[in-house]
Each structure stands twice: as structure tokens, then as C-alpha cells.
């Protein structure tokens, strides 16, 4: 039954979330290690030094969890988009043209628009505004999955069904670009400018973990609940990240302050 499938999905999701939280909390404990033990961080390689410096920041655990789950809703749906197109009877040509080629162009356009909005309104506001738009786009696919019948021999897709899925794909691609622009701006803003490349790689690795989980869980969720129910559920996966925004705001302020203090003073 659908309700049992939902319960199982959330049990697995919470189990993974708790495990990740426990691991991050354990890593964050290194912040309280004796100062003498931190003197050799730099001698253990740039990656290790960057990791230790990152984990000693105040409030880093909630921020790492935010990075982990901010695009979880988008990733969870993304893995099942192509199977949904196929099961709905769309041709490989349509999938390649609309979902891939046009979708890529709209994602780039969304990235440009998201970058403009982030620059005008600031990273913090862009994260929750553009992140919300990114989540709402999942409902378009949920609607399409509820309306479009499964493919069957002899059936021809109606024009309105094609138009509905084309529209859902366009909105999802564009808003995905919006959210990505704000998210990448956030990652670049909080890295230490002295080791930006290394810290950015570490933070990107944390983000990649959510895609790994989403790839595994998406097939189970879609099979258990159907495409429409699963796409609708992914909409709600976006909101846990919003509870962590206070820590995100504090981290942005801390990074901005640290960057300002590092700038050389202007001398007359």
C-alpha cells in the first residue's frame, strides 16, 4: 500500500540522515582537540589542513548538513525523470531534444538569472527564494505524472499531455539553474580564500553524498509510490534545509567578516 511505502521511504531517509549527522558531529569534535595537536595540521598535506580548519569553524555541522540536503529534492526527482518519460511513451528523440538539449539551455539561462538575482539580493535571500522555486517545480512533474496515462500499445499521446510534460521539464530545468547559482555562490562565499580550491572540493564532496543517496532511494520510492506520489513527496524533501538557514546566515556573516579583516588596510 502507498502509506506503507511512504513510511518505509522515510525510515530509510531518516536512518541515513541520522547516520550522516552522527558522523559530522564526530568530525566536528576535532574542534575541541588540544591546541598542541593542531600545530602539525599543515605538515599533513593541504587537504588534511583544509579539512581540519573547516571542521573547527563554529556552527559547521548544521552548515554541512545544509549543503548535504539543499538540493536533495531536486536530485531525488532528477534520477526518475528519464524513466518517467520513457514509461509515458515519449520517444528517444523527444527525450533528447526537450529534456536534454533544451533543458540544458534552460538550466544555463536559469544559472545566469540566478546569478543576477544573487548579486542583487544577496546569497542568503537567494538561497531560500530560489531554493523554494526549485522545489515548487517538482510539483509540475507530480501533476504531469498524475494526468498522463502510462504508455500502452496502440495509444497515442495527446497534445495536451505532451504540452504539460514539456512545460514541466522547462520549468524544472530553469528553476534548477536558479537554485544551483545561489548554492554555488554560497559555497564560494564560505571557503577560506587562502585555500579556496581545496575547501570548495571538500564541500562539493559533501554535496555529492546527497546525490548518491538520492540515486539509491529514488528507484525504490518511484516503484513503491508511483511517479506522481514520488514526485509529490520530493517537493517536501526541500524543506528540512530551511530549518538550517539561521546557521547558514551566521556562517555567511562570519566568512564576510573574516574576508574583510584579511584585506589590507588602505593607507593614505
Region spans (language model):
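Intracellular juxtamembrane helix-capping segments at the cytosolic ends
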Residues: 178-192
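Short amphipathic helix-loop junctions that connect adjacent transmembrane helices
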Residues: 79-96
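Juxtamembrane intracellular "pre-TM" segments in multi-pass secondary transporters
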Residues: 1-4, 32-62
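Loop-to-transmembrane helix entry/capping segments in MFS-fold secondary transporters
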Residues: 92-93, 193-203
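Cytoplasmic membrane-interface "Motif A"-like loop-to-helix N-cap segments
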Residues: 119-133
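Helix-to-loop junctions at the C-terminal end of transmembrane segments
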Residues: 109-123, 222-223
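Multi-pass alpha-helical transporter architecture, strongest
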Residues: 26-30, 230-264
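C-terminal ends and interior cores of transmembrane alpha-helices
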Residues: 132-158, 246
Amino acid at each position: 500500500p502507498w502509506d506503507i511505502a511512504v513510511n518505509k521511504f522515510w525510515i530509510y531517509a531518516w536512518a541515513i540522515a541520522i547516520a550522516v549527522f552522527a558522523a559530522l558531529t564526530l568530525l566536528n569534535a576535532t574542534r575541541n582537540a588540544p591546541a598542541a595537536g593542531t600545530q602539525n595540521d599543515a605538515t599533513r598535506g593541504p587537504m588534511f589542513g583544509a579539512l581540519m580548519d573547516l571542521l573547527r569553524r563554529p556552527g559547521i555541522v548544521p552548515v554541512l548538513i545544509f549543503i548535504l540536503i539543499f538540493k536533495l529534492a531536486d536530485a531525488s526527482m532528477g534520477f526518475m525523470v528519464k524513466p518517467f518519460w520513457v514509461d509515458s511513451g515519449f520517444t528517444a528523440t523527444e527525450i533528447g531534444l526537450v529534456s536534454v538539449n533544451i533543458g540544458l539551455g534552460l538550466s544555463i539561462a536559469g544559472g545566469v538569472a540566478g546569478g543576477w538575482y544573487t548579486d542583487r539580493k544577496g546569497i542568503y535571500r537567494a538561497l531560500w527564494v530560489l531554493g523554494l522555486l526549485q522545489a515548487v517545480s517538482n510539483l509540475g512533474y507530480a501533476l504531469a505524472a498524475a494526468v498522463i496515462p502510462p504508455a500502452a500499445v496502440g495509444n497515442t499521446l495527446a497534445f495536451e499531455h505532451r504540452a504539460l510534460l514539456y512545460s514541466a521539464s522547462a520549468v524544472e530545468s530553469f528553476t534548477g539553474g536558479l537554485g544551483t547559482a545561489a548554492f554555488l555562490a554560497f559555497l564560494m562565499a564560505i571557503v577560506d580564500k587562502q585555500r579556496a580550491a581545496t575547501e570548495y572540493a571538500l564541500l562539493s564532496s559533501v554535496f555529492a553524498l546527497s546525490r548518491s543517496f538520492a540515486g539509491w532511494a529514488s528507484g525504490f520510492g518511484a516503484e513503491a509510490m508511483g511517479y506522481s506520489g514520488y514526485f509529490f513527496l520530493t517537493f517536501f524533501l526541500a524543506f528540512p534545509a530551511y530549518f538550517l538557514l539561521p546557521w547558514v546566515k551566521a556562517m555567511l556573516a562570519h566568512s564576510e567578516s573574516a574576508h574583510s579583516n584579511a584585506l589590507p588596510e588602505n593607507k593614505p
